[in-house]
């Protein structure tokens, strides 16, 4: 009996978890703009010898789909935080 109750509770919570996940995911149009802006930042960093050496990891990928697909799975706020991290790095290495 308790196994059935546990199963019912688990199944009834599933739609709420799905809705919560969808509420956090970013909009595809937002993610296209995010990925374009990320690539502009990456290109800017690669073109500056003072910055290029520190461009490591997926944050600095030259592949549009890496940025776009990542963005689709996170909130707008998380995408903004990633953009801001790239901006801070670029300002630091260029001195601007």
Sequence positions of predicted segments:
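C-terminal segment of classical bacterial N-terminal signal peptides
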Residues: 16-22
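Functionally constrained cores in energy, signaling, and assembly domains
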Residues: 8, 15, 82
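Bacterial N-terminal signal peptides that target proteins for export
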Residues: 1-10
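Intrinsic disorder/low-complexity segments in short proteins, especially the signal peptide
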Residues: 10-11, 22
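Compositionally biased regions
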Residues: 11-13, 62
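Extracytoplasmic/lumenal soluble domains of exported proteins with redox or metal-associated functions
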Residues: 2, 15-16
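Post-signal/leader-peptide non-cytosolic segments of secretory proteins
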Residues: 25-96
């Amino acid at each position: 009996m308790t196994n059935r109750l546990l199963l019912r509770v688990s199944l009834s919570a599933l739609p709420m978890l799905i809705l919560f996940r969808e509420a956090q995911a970013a909009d595809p149009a937002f993610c296209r703009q995010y990925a374009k802006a990320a690539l502009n930042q990456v290109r800017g960093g690669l073109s500056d010898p003072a910055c290029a050496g520190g461009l490591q990891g997926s944050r600095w990928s030259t592949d549009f789909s890496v940025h776009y697909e990542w963005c689709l799975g996170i909130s707008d706020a998380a995408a903004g935080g990633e953009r801001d991290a790239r901006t801070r790095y670029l300002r630091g290495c260029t001195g601007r």
